[in-house]
Swiss-Prot record:
Residues 1-16 form the signal peptide. It holds the Pfam family CRA. This is Circumsporozoite protein-related antigen. The keyword RNA-binding does not apply. Disulfide bonds: none annotated.
Length: 162
């Protein structure tokens, strides 16, 4: 720590001596006017180069335009990706809903349509697809009246509902 503080003190004195020497040389010329003031009054050239500043401003403006173009391309790409992500998530949610609905009903998870096997095996639809006219079968009394249970008359309800 002591070595470091000695180093910085020496550096400070060197810098301080350079500044004091520069002041002494300016005072030693006898005019007492600094060189900056001479440039202002003596010549018509400005201290700041305006042409360099303007060219730097133009370069910065061109860089900003390029950055904005890149940003617009990225913005378009992110908008497209967001749209695609929305479509994919909608399809996935629909698929999950279909699977949950079908498993609740006891069907195959990806089945779409009616779950009644009688609807799927409709003989009328087969005859219509063959081009044959649909002949209405005559309804008999046996088809309309329910069958009476045979045997015990007290047991009117039958089936797995007991």
């Amino acid at each position: 720590m002591k070595i470091l503080s000695v180093f910085f003190l020496a550096l400070f004195f060197i810098i301080f001596n350079k500044e004091s020497l520069a002041e002494k040389t300016n005072k030693g010329t006898g005019s007492g006017v600094s060189s900056k003031k001479k440039n202002k009054k003596g010549s018509g050239e400005p201290l700041i180069d305006v042409h360099d500043l303007i060219s730097d401003m133009i370069k910065k403006e061109e860089e900003l335009v390029e950055v904005n173009k890149r940003k617009s391309k990225y913005k378009l790409a992110t908008s497209v990706l967001a749209g695609l992500l929305g479509v994919v998530s909608t399809v996935l949610l629909g698929g999950v809903g279909l699977v949950l609905y079908n498993t609740e009903k006891g069907r195959h998870p990806f089945k779409i349509g009616s779950s009644d096997p009688a609807d799927n095996a409709n003989p009328d639809a087969d005859s219509e697809s063959n081009g044959e006219p649909n002949a209405d079968p005559q309804v008999t009394a046996q088809d309309v009246t329910p069958e009476q249970p045979q045997g015990d008359d007290n047991n009117l309800v039958s089936g797995p509902e007991h």
